[in-house]
UniProtKB/Swiss-Prot annotation:
Origin species: Hyphomonas neptunium (strain ATCC 15444)
Keywords: ATP-binding, Kinase, Lipid A biosynthesis, Lipid biosynthesis, Lipid metabolism, Nucleotide-binding, Transferase
Pathway noted in the entry: Glycolipid biosynthesis; lipid IV(A) biosynthesis; lipid IV(A) from (3R)-3-hydroxytetradecanoyl-[acyl-carrier-protein] and UDP-N-acetyl-alpha-D-glucosamine: step 6/6
Presence of keyword ATP-binding: yes
Protein name (Swiss-Prot/TrEMBL): Tetraacyldisaccharide 4'-kinase
Taxon lineage: Bacteria, Pseudomonadati, Pseudomonadota, Alphaproteobacteria, Hyphomonadales
Function of the protein: Transfers the gamma-phosphate of ATP to the 4'-position of a tetraacyldisaccharide 1-phosphate intermediate (termed DS-1-P) to form tetraacyldisaccharide 1,4'-bis-phosphate (lipid IVA).
Keyword S-adenosyl-L-methionine part of the UniProt annotation: no
């Protein structure tokens, strides 16, 4: 779904745009959601995996950059000589898992967009039952499991928890779902974490400073310059505007931009609409790599994908955070 406009932090809470009546009506649902999450976390008995588990999660609904961060950390672990694999729930996919994702056989409708994207550059698994999936991964030879987006899932014991926060839009309006974008109260989420990865430019949020957690700075960097000529950009991610702005700032000639809801399953009708829009502008279509894998197969060859990667400012600091995991996995 598209993030409601009133989730934004840049609004006067009493203004019409901030939808004070809507927020008031959603307050009981936010309280119920928070009560259910706290109860689930309190009653949980996490199962230990046969190998170390690194959780890469966040505190908001989408848009923080977990997937490229997961890919970058997986690459860092692999460069140390260890076999690392990502584990996702497989949101939006029909397969329950445990399943090793194969880009040659699976589509986003099978396994979800993020696992399919991660499988394009390394080993990726899905599993709705995380402990069962972790056992299957270890039996297959994985030495370290990167649990993509599992901070609010207590079923699997984590050896290290990293929270990804978008420095440009850390916590939205500060309210919990559905009143705001937060999956839980910020201090409670940070209390279960070991470090914070702050994505992009912006100050360290006061809540993070108060937590005394180590902060790793990272940013998204394009792997290639935007293609020349006019472009019609579209995206169905947590913060589509972030993609549009990045594309323009990198020199892309963005004639028009179309936001879709997060994890939007593109249809032939969507593609036809986008083709028509591009034709009107005399432009080519371009989207994120995550959106590209959700396109109908017959449309993927004609639509451009603009790849980005997560770059850590201080890789030595990242290695220091990962050191206990390396040690447990048998790599001094």
């Amino acid at each position: 779904m598209k993030a409601p406009y009133f989730w934004s932090a840049d609004l006067d809470p009493k203004s019409r745009e901030a939808a004070p009546l809507t927020r008031l009506l959603l307050t009981p649902f936010a309280m119920l959601y928070l009560w259910a999450l706290r109860r689930k976390l309190a009653k949980a008995r996490p199962e230990a995996a046969p190998v170390p588990v690194v959780c890469i999660g966040n505190l908001t609904a989408g848009g923080a950059g977990k997937t490229p961060v997961t890919e970058a950390i997986r690459n860092r672990i692999r460069s140390a000589g260890l076999r690392a694999a990502s584990l996702s729930r497989g949101h939006g996919g029909a397969e329950p898992g445990p399943l090793k994702v194969d880009p040659a056989r699976h589509t986003s409708r099978d396994v979800g967009d993020e696992p399919l994207l991660l499988a394009g550059s390394g080993e990726a698994w899905i599993g709705r039952k995380r402990p069962e999936a972790a056992r299957a991964m270890a039996a297959d030879g994985a030495e370290i499991i990167l649990m993509d987006d599992g901070h609010q899932n207590p079923s699997l014991k984590k050896d290290l928890t990293l929270i990804v926060i978008d420095a440009g839009a850390p916590f939205g309006n500060g309210h919990v779902l559905p009143k705001g974008p937060l999956r839980e109260k910020v201090p409670e989420g940070l209390a279960r974490a070991d470090a914070v990865i702050l994505m992009g430019a912006g100050p360290v949020p006061p809540e993070v400073t108060a937590s005394s957690l180590p902060v790793l700075r990272a940013r998204l960097a394009p792997l290639a310059a935007p293609p020349p000529g006019p472009l019609v950009a579209f995206a169905g991610i947590g913060r589509p505007q972030k993609f549009f702005d990045s594309l323009a700032q990198a020199g892309g000639n963005v004639s028009d931009a179309v936001p879709f809801g997060d994890h939007h399953p593109y249809t032939k009708g969507d593609v036809q609409f986008l083709r028509s829009l591009a034709h009107d502008h005399g432009a080519r279509l371009i989207t994120t790599t995550k959106d590209h894998v959700r396109l109908p197969l017959d449309a993927q060859s004609e639509i451009l994908a603009w790849p980005v990667t997560a770059v850590f400012e201080d890789t030595a600091a990242l290695d220091a955070v990962l050191a206990p995991i390396f040690k447990r996995a048998g790599k001094p």
